[in-house]
Amino acid sequence: MRTAQVADDDLSYLTYYADNIAAFTDRREAEDGENGFDKTVPLDSVFNILNGNHEKKHYAMQVLDPNAGINYPTDHPVSMDEHFYKTVIQNITECLRGIELDEKYLNSLLSVLEANLSYIPSSTSKKELTDISLYDHVKMTAAIAACTEQFLEEKQEKNYRKHLFENAKQSYEEKMFLLYSMDISGIQNFIYTVGESGVLKGLRARSFYLEIMMEHVVDELLEKLALSRANLIYTGGGHCYMLLPNTKDVKNAIADYEKELNAWMMQQFDTALYVASGYAPASANELRDEPEGSYSGLYLKISKMIAGKKAHRYDAAMIRALNKKRHSGDRECKVCRRMAELADDKCEMCNALEKMSGNVLYDPYFTVVRRKEKNALPLPGEKYLVADTKESLLKRMQQDGYVRSYTCLLYTSPSPR
């Protein structure tokens, strides 16, 4: 970049800066490292050095394939070859031909990269550990770049060369980022609220519904913040972590969204489910744990913020609204025990969950739509969840009410397609 003939506000400076930070966080020297590079080195398991381990397990050359089974780490020799890399390049090239390079296809692009780069090491240096995939490195680079751009935009700073390249060391101390977390309370009680018959089906449907709901909540928030799933670090079990820009607009948006979610939760489930979120401002140096202990300190700050909200769930206005709430029926659902209009002694929600329990086993796609349909499950933001086959999904994607879809073909945790 030092000799590059590009404008001071060129986005390449953002990419260069973000790539350096991502490299700080995922590249560490090996104890017995040597000089040079080895393009045949496979991706090592992250568990090789966990808890003092000294293992040498690594992954086979593979792209993500639902028919190939799980690629478990192995002790057997693995050597990456030119043919595999050419196959990966060809796969990505062919997929890119069918993708428009705009914000609507960002998550599709991420899925393509995940499928092809998940078992390729981000570094082939003999001096470094090779347990971080190229996909994770690229994804983190994109997240950091997006955060940095929004942070500098709020400061009306357009000279990327000066701020991120010439003054890079100083910028590593700026708290450009928010490490953000969201947690749903009450999920265990919700999952185990099942009827006397069809217990396993009920458990499966309720667990799946909460997982899809969390994925939907994450996607809705990222859309509000003009970010992509590159900024999502983890989601599962009613919990998520994201890397967000440290701006006033973002802080206001996540506060408003939390209130919106809890109002919806109260309307749908009374006090059974509650959302609490927290965040900690972070610098690039803190993300790579400089000084030592600063990274874990971020999580401690987040946990304290979330714990404080859980201890004081509702403000006076929400408590008054809860006390004034009128139920639509005068009979008690035999499953969830809430007052509602019933069909077969069950409320609309429990009937829809019962129907969804069969869809979870046999339908590969689950779609978020804007219009309510029969047996559709409600989602925050006046959206609904329905099950689809491949054929019905293709038809639905041409309709105005289509929002997004999730599939479990490749992953335990649904990813948008």
Predicted regions and their residues:
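An active-site-proximal "capping" alpha-helix that borders the catalytic cofactor pocket
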Residues: 1
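Regulatory and interdomain segments flanking nucleotide-handling catalytic cores
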Residues: 5-417
